[in-house]
Amino acid sequence: MTHSSQDAGSHGIQEEGRLYVVDSINDLNKLSLCPMESQHLFSLEDKIPNAGTAPGNGRRGLFFVGLLLVLTVSLALVFFAIFLIIQTGNQMEDVSRRLTAEGKDIDDLKKINNMIVKRLNQLDSEQN
């Protein structure tokens, strides 16, 4: 049983060695150090599928672009909502300041009105 596991391990090492040899030959072909006939013997590019041509990558890319667009729009809406909340708070502070200022003015007007009424009552009582 241990012999079969060693065979599997040595088989993997042999395959890695073959891939290394093929890769080295391809590198030599790229440098034009090998004859032209050997260029087509060990082409890994033909055996390994291109990751960009797998079916569904277009949909996946479109999905991620759509997701990115939705996240960007939602982030913009959140910032807009925060901006509106801050603006509303500032306007409420302005209104409350005006109301307190007008309240003081109204109190002053009431005092002046009371003084005028008292003075008119005094003048009316003096005339009678």
From Swiss-Prot:
The lineage of its organism: Eukaryota, Metazoa, Chordata, Craniata, Vertebrata. This is Leucine-rich single-pass membrane protein 1. One of its GO terms (cellular component) is membrane. It is found in: Membrane. It comes from Mus musculus (Mouse). The modification Phosphoserine is found at S24. The chain crosses the membrane at residues 66-86. Signal peptide: none annotated. It is a single-pass membrane protein. The gene is Lsmem1. Residues 90-111 form a coiled coil.
